[in-house]
Curated annotation (Swiss-Prot):
The keyword Secreted does not apply. Belongs to the LpxK family. Transfers the gamma-phosphate of ATP to the 4'-position of a tetraacyldisaccharide 1-phosphate intermediate (termed DS-1-P) to form tetraacyldisaccharide 1,4'-bis-phosphate (lipid IVA). GO terms for cellular component: plasma membrane. Keywords: ATP-binding, Kinase, Lipid A biosynthesis, Lipid biosynthesis, Lipid metabolism, Nucleotide-binding, Transferase. The keyword Kinase applies. It catalyses: a lipid A disaccharide + ATP = a lipid IVA + ADP + H(+). GO terms for molecular function: ATP binding; tetraacyldisaccharide 4'-kinase activity. It comes from Nitratidesulfovibrio vulgaris (strain DSM 19637 / Miyazaki F) (Desulfovibrio vulgaris). This is Tetraacyldisaccharide 4'-kinase. GO terms for biological process: lipid A biosynthetic process; lipopolysaccharide core region biosynthetic process.
């Protein structure tokens, strides 16, 4: 079912429902702000990375970037994540690299494996996870992954990630009329906006950015996920390209490949792959976001007869299903590779500094105020 097509066809009926939904979310927000509903308010800074819509926008890569920044500056961080679709053996779950995606969720597991020195906690009740982290870890900083609407945790900074379509056709279209979780007034809580877009697209969005976001008086940064190469995916292989045991390659040298994605924005991954390799995939196998891959999926991929490329988010679920001989002839295993992605920041609006410089300045202010 094409949800967007249904929403467009039924727009006259759905708009009033969307307005009612936005009003309910605004009332909920007011209840938290008035202290009617309880909030976890730790003594250390809390930074939320979230979005206004459902689905993938690039939140988790930004959380990963912040974790790497914290590690480089000698700061401990605790991520409070919901763990979409996860079934943790206990709550909260302190995610370890050895956990499975079924236990922790694909994105928390990816963060834990990419940042083994960070604490990634999964619990749908993030207030509970925060209390546990404060009692057992006392980190310098809390990061809320997908936290914009999770108001049960007080935050010092809200970084809101937007898609280009949020600035055009989806602007202000709340559920069920569109994909937004809240109305436009909610963006007034943001301290910065990050738009996942290539520099050329970000610059082309200038008129929409001016019309939509100037009223909030906050900086707007662009970013993209840029592949640096490929990392072999298989059981027992380290997913981090710089670590011992990781098999890497810079390119496919013009060989054909199949792209497989179980993410929120598969078209963006297709465009990234086409740009990186210089040619499109033979096929693009698109699965739903957070798809729980099974042995049947792996058998299909093994039958492709060429390299199969996926995202790091897909890799954490596919790796356990692939033997240690993955990719070797005669093993009946797919020749599976994942992109080694790096977050790159591009042009900005209403800011004299880049996002890393802006963040460093904001952290200096937060840490001084909280005496971190």
């Amino acid at each position: 079912m094409n949800i967007a097509a249904v929403q467009k066809t039924c727009a006259p009926l759905l708009r009033p429902l969307g307005a009612a939904y936005a009003a309910c979310m605004a009332a909920r927000r007011a209840a938290y702000e008035a202290g009617v509903l309880p909030r976890f308010a730790p003594p250390r800074p809390v930074v939320s990375v979230g979005n206004i819509c459902w689905g993938g926008t690039g939140k988790t890569p930004l959380v990963h970037w912040l974790l790497r920044w914290c590690g480089a500056h000698g700061l401990s961080a605790a991520v409070l994540a919901r763990g979409y679709g996860a079934k943790p053996p206990q709550l909260p779950l302190l995610v370890r690299p050895g956990n499975t995606a079924a236990e922790a969720g694909d994105e928390p597991l990816m963060l834990a494996r990419q940042n083994p020195d960070a604490a990634v906690l999964v619990d749908p009740v993030r207030r509970r996870a925060g209390h546990w982290a404060e009692a057992h870890l006392a980190p310098h900083l809390y990061l809320l992954d997908d936290g914009f609407q999770h108001l049960a945790v007080r935050r010092d900074l809200d970084i809101v990630v937007l898609r280009p379509v949020d600035l055009t056709g989806e602007w202000g279209r709340t559920i069920p009329a569109g994909s937004w979780r809240e109305g436009t007034s909610a963006l007034g809580r943001a301290h910065a906006f990050c738009v996942k877009a290539e520099p050329d697209l970000f610059n082309a969005l200038g008129p929409q950015l001016e019309r939509r976001l100037v009223r909030y008086g906050m900086p707007v940064f662009s970013f993209r996920l840029a592949p640096r190469g490929l990392v072999r995916v298989g059981r027992g292989l380290d997913p981090r390209p710089t670590e011992q045991g990781a098999a890497t390659r810079a390119h496919l040298d013009g060989a054909p490949y199949v792209l497989v994605t179980g993410v929120g924005e598969p078209a963006q991954v297709h465009a990234t792959a086409t740009h990186f390799f210089g040619y499109p995939p033979l096929r693009h196998r698109i699965f739903p976001d957070h798809h729980p891959y099974g042995p049947g999926d792996v058998r299909q991929l093994a039958g492709e007869g060429c390299a199969v490329v996926c995202t790091p988010k897909d890799a954490v679920k596919l790796a356990p299903l692939c033997g240690e001989g993955a990719g070797h002839e005669g093993t009946n295993q797919p020749d599976l590779w994942a992109f080694d992605l790096v977050t790159e920041f591009g042009p900005a609006l209403w800011s004299a500094t880049s996002f890393p410089e802006w963040w460093a300045a904001r952290w200096a202010g937060l840490s001084a105020a909280r005496r971190v």
